[in-house]
Amino acid sequence: MSASASLPVTRAAAAPRITVLFSTEKPNANTNPYLTQLYDALPDAVQPRFFSMREALLSRYDVLHLHWPEYLLRHPSKMGTLAKQACAALLLMKLQLTGTPVVRTLHNLAPHEDRGWRERALLRWIDQLTRRWIRINATTPVRPPFTDTILHGHYRDWFATMEQGTTVPGRLLHFGLIRPYKGVEVLLDVMRDVQDPRLSLRIVGNPATPQMRTLVETACAQDARISALLAYVEEPVLAREVSACELVVLPYKQMHNSGTLLLALSLARPVLAPWSESNAAIAEEVGPGWVFLYEGEFDAALLSGMLDQVRAAPRGPAPDLSQRDWPRIGQLHYRTYLEALGKDGDAAL
């Protein structure tokens, strides 16, 4: 056998096997597709295990990988929250005593809601124990001691086999969990002031609060151009809803990392979003005609002119998402885990 032919066997044998405990539950039909695709993309040398507090406290693993750590500290009831926070403190003591490295993915610069001083203190402790950070866009500020850039993967493969909807001319779409920071209330107010009869607005997603549900239902009752599907929707339904629109509208009050934006691009739909450094980087990455950015107020004048602008913009058949392919993302995560353990990360590549 030639030396080149034997190289893959040598590399595979040299790749250290490691066990990674993820802070999320075992994937199911309702799991965020980002997580499901990440777990599927990990190389065979990574043995994934999924979170329970019992597993985290009593078992052995090489690395703890945290996504959205605030959710480990929260419960609908006050007593449940106290219990989860007490268990989390025990876990952090264990990690500190055993020297188990923590890897943390920065999905947000900070939690969207502030849940009090105990949560803030525990999150600071987690920060202190984090040995490597993963930022999913290159504009996120780096954090000590080490930060790795692994771009958020696309959803193109995830939706490839799902039926696409027929485009409804003039339809605008806002989708995802309906939360106050996403600007839905502003979008509804602006839509009432838009005079263009070609435009309609579709809201798809589960309201985070009863107040948000009432807000959307009232707008639908008052304006026949506005319709909504207010529920958690399965992915085939979501694929049809997204592909049926001409433009996805995301008037977020704050926007740094957005899986919603990438999901829309994965289904080849143009997006209107506020200017931010991260959104500008994505707009440049994917090519012209896919991401339209605005600065200042989101208002009727802006929304009224968007349909003609989107239709006139030159664009390719699909946005360029080649930097976000999952096999490479899995290998880069493996490298981060090895380096968190003080091993040679090049063994992963």
From Swiss-Prot:
It is found in: Cell inner membrane. It catalyses: beta-D-GlcA-(1->2)-alpha-D-Man-(1->3)-beta-D-Glc-(1->4)-alpha-D-Glc-di-trans,octa-cis-undecaprenyl diphosphate + GDP-alpha-D-mannose = beta-D-Man-(1->4)-beta-D-GlcA-(1->2)-alpha-D-Man-(1->3)-beta-D-Glc-(1->4)-alpha-D-Glc-di-trans,octa-cis-undecaprenyl diphosphate + GDP + H(+). Its EC number is 2.4.1.251. GO terms for molecular function: glycosyltransferase activity. It comes from the Bacteria. The keyword Membrane applies. One of its GO terms (cellular component) is plasma membrane. Keywords: Carbohydrate metabolism, Cell inner membrane, Cell membrane, Glycosyltransferase, Membrane, Signal, Transferase. Its main location: membrane. It is an enzyme of class 2 (transferase). Residues 1-14 form the signal peptide. Pfam families: Glyco_trans_1_4. Pathway: Glycan biosynthesis; xanthan biosynthesis. Belongs to the glycosyltransferase 94 family. Nonprocessive beta-mannosyltransferase that catalyzes the transfer of a mannose residue from GDP-mannose to glucuronic acid-beta-1,2-mannose-alpha-1,3-glucose-beta-1,4-glucose-PP-polyisoprenyl to form the lipid-linked pentasaccharide repeating unit of xanthan, Man-GlcA-Man-Glc(2)-PP-Pol. Is involved in the biosynthesis of the exopolysaccharide xanthan. This is GDP-mannose:glycolipid 4-beta-D-mannosyltransferase. It comes from Xanthomonas campestris pv. campestris (strain ATCC 33913 / DSM 3586 / NCPPB 528 / LMG 568 / P 25). The gene is gumI.
